[in-house]
């Protein structure tokens, strides 16, 4: 009996495993049915099914899943599943959104039935996931079903895989799922309800299916079709012809493939060079491209029609898009070749083999879609009531809102809509009236199209079906029930239509009326008369002859801008001159394009009335609300400047920035609405295009622009100061603006007259055809059609805001090709360009049907494109029915199905065959299951990227079909079993943990590592993108180059590194330990261990962009000198987070505290490398336990111990190397890794990073300069502080000189770290370097670490448990390091820290990450800021904190609460209030930390607790490292050990520290796991810690002061509070962010993090876990932070942060915090980081490892699980990890985190570019429609339509209306171009930084004069870019402020007019 019972139980477990591991739809259903049969369960009983299943399946793997589902189901909104118990729901379509909706309805207790037309999931296409979707799916147990789910930095998943996950969850919850059932319609309730009470039913096929008998109260359409459910009207969004191509290639999961960098998205507007190179090399012309590595290699791109025609993909050019893309008109072989060529080029030919995966027809999986038109449903739901039965009908997914695929919004908005629909059903079931239900649903739906990852709520753990938890400012009662009555269908369709018409009219009539009042010619004439009244010789009586003399125009301009025209000097007789003067000034100063020339005006008898109306209307709209100058004669100078600014056009502003723009003032309100992230702004612009029926849409822009402009102008009064400042800056910028743009743009003004050889303004300059007023554009005195305005070289359509004009030949070019003008046209000249699309080709257009009535080609699109026509319903298209029926992909799939069946008679290939062919390697290796298993396993997996490839993998699909029989023969269960066999054990461990959040995060991290291991490829991916992508230049280009150079340098330097032997040992160790041979091999093999890592690091750096570079620089800096230190610290105040850079700091410290911060930045570079590390951090996390991911940012020190797990260490080590090789050189500096572990090595590390750093630095430099960089150089304790303090004030002055000095110093330091003779800029640095480079670093670090220790001793008590151990161990090291340090002196002490920075790096890296991330965020865009609420402040605060530590510390603390610990340290300044503020900040940061890190935070915090204190203290000391020689004793115990370690490592060698480090790591891991065991515990601890920190800060103040007195003399008072604060902070952070504060390394992290930014610190420290998971990006940020330079960069790149604010509203705070924090944060942060990490990298690593283990155990794993893992790890990984290895691990983690952060940043920037691109296309299409209507009206008015000339008032009224709309579109376009310009500058800045980094990697004495001059040139150019961005941001900010007050009224007005939706 017992045996049979056990057998049955085991059988159930096997069946459950088979179900979980099933990889096909049918296999899943079959496995589930078998499980239910075995357990004797019947899914029909939906209410109790799940509970019965749970009770009968007592399996530890299942329990982890039950725990997750129980947690989700226990949410109060579901009311224990009793809300909808009597509600029956039918969901059409088992796609991701349909299944997600079903799950929520099931949790509400409803009876849910899902019907799916097919029985196979065959879509390999990849979906981008927003952070909240990842969190949501994790909560549903996604990782239990798919172990690789979003591991590491992965943020995407294939549709097939996502469907499988959701299908399994749905089945477990008792949802009925029927496949092969097609919905055909609704069956109304019969009229005879007396005999049979039958409700609503579904008509399905097959008709006899049981579902046809079901009755439903709710039906939800989620099948992606547009017409499945009737009654939903659709809004059409039409852009330019958009042809999308998707391609899936087989992914064999080889090492080579793993190394290929993903392309998260590249848009033409974002990276033109890449696409131009692609076109020149292959003839392929794309708008954008995305590459995701998933089950397949997935590519999706938007191709230009002409390119497809040229390449023979499309055979004939048709106007109708359906004909154009029909199978008969497409050459499939050419299409395959086209897709393969594009994929090959975009990945830099690095994918070894591009074999197509097969679709479900056995054909290559390549498809082409028409995305020209996209639709959104006007409503989300409606109610039908027939014969007494009500039916709630709703839409979700693509059926509701079609996404623009490059935006990656589809699945996220689909999930949001699914939750909103569930909430609606809940309200419905609770008895709410139908109209109220609909009103609430529509109120919520209006927000959906505006959602972005930045403007949804950030507290993902609070998400529920309640909209309030997801939308920050939702008003669920926005619409009244009476406003949705038309959605209540009672069967009387007549009434419904009448109601709808009334509603539409009520919405649009007011707007039209207003437009009419504005448009009346009498009103315009009256306004002109008032403006010209009193001017001599001016008498305006009409809109024609009165203006001929030109005086009236000049009078209007003079009235508002008397500074532009000397009216009294004008001669009334000189008509031509007067008019030309007015035209030129209006274009140049006001952005109003001329409609004719002065000569033309003088030559005509009577000016053309239509042209004059068009022209004067622009003046009216610009000045109507402005105050005439005469009335302002009594204004003071400032107010007058404000007035001038108010009439300045953004376009003219842009042109002065080197952008040739000639347009009207920008539609500020739309600009922000569209791009800001803020829903409101978006709404407005959106409303134009989508809210109401197309008929009224035209008027909308007018309303929007009118309202906006008026309010904007009215609000000018007090908000113009910013604009005034921007105007003031213009003069400077005009001098600095890129010569090309300036020259190019203004050249035209010289020659404004209309060319004599042409007819005039009514003749096109290009095609010589008639140009009507409405379609007329002018530039450089030429008039032309919009469609004729193309680049002479490449035929790309130009915009007035971005072109280059060659005066010598009168030709126009796109900016990238302006330099080709002398070399003649390229192979593809304009003729080829015509291909762009029939619509775009000027001359060739005529042949296409696009030519319009006027006989000229249609301006906008080729006939094909136009065919869709403006009609809302698409009636003009033959394919209307199809278009209304399905989405682009569905139409293509259906066409494909029909054509394939007809032509080839192919049948569908079974899902199993398809999966076997496409995913053979994955299936064979059981990767999915294994990955999911456990963190250790994940790590292993991660480290073994190469997976065995299946024999079938490369087999052609036909061959696969042949094997079909065999495949079928093998049951899916067997396949799954074999697949998951490997995953079994480890997976079990993982799942046992159940609460695998941390575990998952670990896995994620590990997998991310894997990913990132591929990211070694990652760097390459970037390279691929970046190199080819100079277009990608924004982020990639520079970085790639840098990476390569760095790698080469590394290869050369590796031997030179101070500890070449050590580095190599570390590499070897890493290899040995690493269970990821692939990664290691790749790294080692490719670059001699260093090379590959270098690539990885580079990648990370690239991703992190600025941060890693800074970190690297910092590393180099230590060797550099005080001078360098000054610069570095200024720029690298943020670097402090780069505690990794401590080694650098050490030397720097010696030179100058400021410097040291920069050095940390150097370490930061590793932190950035953390991009790589971030990939590795997961491994560390696994090793560490849950912590590694989160830890990676702060607990990195622990992480190394955690990393002791075989994989983590290996990862870490490579990562460490990678960090060292942020610049390629780093790789060769395995010693660099050692530096992470040992102090000497940091030098090399620094060296490598330095190159990277310099570019980064250069960018941050300005900010740093602002911060007391100079003081940092003082490097001496007192001086540093004071200097820092003063530095802030001297921000501007310091900027350039500091930058230059910083670069020199960096360069020297880099050389040192590389092992070359560094240029000693300061005795300190020389001293540090005197000892072996490592030793020098240790020496400098040593004193610092001592100081830190002094500070730390108090923290140690707090840490007690861990701290005690940590402290004890550190103590021995401390003694050692103290001696070293003492001899070395404070500087050397710092250096010691530097060398220990390896460890410190770990800790630092985590902390660094925070700053890095912050910095990264800042630099990339505010968008990054959102991920970490603290970041916005941190960016500013980070710098402030660092600088502040010396001088602003106190202040900054208050300003930047998030990084209180850091702040606390910075407050070392004597000011006590600042200290208090710091304390407060700390508390706040602590509180924020838990929030930011969520569970992960808690975990990290616990782990870090001990260390946090220390690290905080250390950090505090760090700022004034020079002052801290004495503190070294206190620090010695905890941090001292780090220093001792560092020194001993340097002196004794890694071995001594190695054992200790291991032990410490193990202890720390355990402690952390324990502390993080439960989220609640963590949160509580975090809160307690924050309180304790405050108290401690107060208490510690006294303690700390004494220790830091010597060095910190200046900052001693703040230091006191700071010290205590750091401890408390450390304590809190330990709980919240153990990595940073808890260990020496952690401490360093904390300090750097703290310094980099409170928010960041918070995130990183408190998000050990979060770092791993949701915060991983933040963690990355930290690694980035580590390159605090990134933070500095933020400060330096204020424009970036400002830009961010433009989008996310962080600008104000950021500015404030930036100003303050930048200065102090870099130096203090850097100093602290350097000292602490250096203190005892190894021991800390060990402690950290222990803590990580304990933390991860607590949070995710059961203690047993953790122990099991630990033992496994022990067996797997030789416990002989040396400090180097541990450091390498940490470094890798840091790199991964940085890489991850950078990737997110790039993705956000990409999305911004794509938003702009898409909106520009919308504007272009709308302008084309307006032009067509305008031409028709103009012809009628002129009598050209064969009707004779008419002066019909109605026609004139229509003309006025069209003119207004066009003006609105012009303004809107100019706004978009400003945003595009900002992106361009951001990109340029990024590239320059990278180039500078690379150059700084070479020692100055090895450079030629030319090279040195080039460095200076690059620096100057970068400063110019920063200034331009500042000015742009100031302009945007001013506009934002002006709109702030109007927003509420404007939003209300717009919404009331129907402008509520803006979808893209």
UniProtKB/Swiss-Prot annotation:
Q: Which UniProt keywords apply?
A: Actin-binding, Cell projection, Coiled coil, Cytoplasm, Cytoskeleton, Exocytosis, FAD, Flavoprotein, LIM domain, Metal-binding, Monooxygenase, NADP, Nucleus, Oxidoreductase, Phosphoprotein, Zinc
Q: Which GO terms describe its molecular function?
A: actin binding; F-actin monooxygenase activity; FAD binding; metal ion binding; oxidoreductase activity, acting on paired donors, with incorporation or reduction of molecular oxygen, NAD(P)H as one donor, and incorporation of one atom of oxygen
Q: Where is the composition biased (Basic and acidic residues)?
A: 669-679, 1039-1051, 1072-1084, 1379-1393, 1616-1627, 1762-1778
Essential cofactor(s): FAD
Q: Which cell locations does it reside in?
A: Cytoplasm; Cytoplasm, Cell cortex; Cytoplasm, Cytoskeleton; Nucleus
Q: What is its EC number?
A: 1.14.13.225
Assembly, in brief, is: Interacts with RAB1B, RAB8A, RAB10, RAB13 and RAB15 (in their GTP-bound forms); binding to RAB1B is of low affinity compared to other Rab proteins; at least in case of RAB8A can bind 2 molecules of RAB8A simultaneously through a high and a low affinity binding site, respectively. Interacts with ERC1 and RAB8A; may bridge ERC1 with RAB8A. Interacts with KIF23 and ERC1; enhances the interaction between KIF23 and ERC1. Interacts with NINL.
Task: Report whether Membrane shows up as a keyword of the record.
Answer: no
Q: Which residues carry this modification: Phosphothreonine?
A: 887, 1252, 1317, 1425
Q: Where is the composition biased (Polar residues)?
A: 1277-1286, 1407-1425, 1718-1727
Residues in bMERB domain copies: 1799-1948
Record-given protein name: [F-actin]-monooxygenase MICAL3
Give the UniProt entry's GO cellular component terms: cell cortex; cell projection; midbody; nucleus; spindle
The entry assigns this protein to a family as follows:
Belongs to the Mical family.
Instruction: Note one Pfam family from the annotation.
Output: CH
Task performed by this protein: Monooxygenase that promotes depolymerization of F-actin by mediating oxidation of specific methionine residues on actin to form methionine-sulfoxide, resulting in actin filament disassembly and preventing repolymerization. In the absence of actin, it also functions as a NADPH oxidase producing H(2)O(2). Seems to act as Rab effector protein and play a role in vesicle trafficking. Involved in exocytic vesicles tethering and fusion: the monooxygenase activity is required for this process and implicates RAB8A associated with exocytotic vesicles. Required for cytokinesis.
Annotated region Monooxygenase domain: the residues are: 2-494
In the record's own words, the domains note is: The bivalent Mical/EHBP Rab binding (bMERB) domain, mediates binding to predominantly Rab8, Rab10, Rab10, Rab13 and Rab15 (in their GTP-bound forms).
Sequence positions that bind Zn(2+) 1: 764, 767, 785, 788
Protein species of origin: Bos taurus (Bovine)
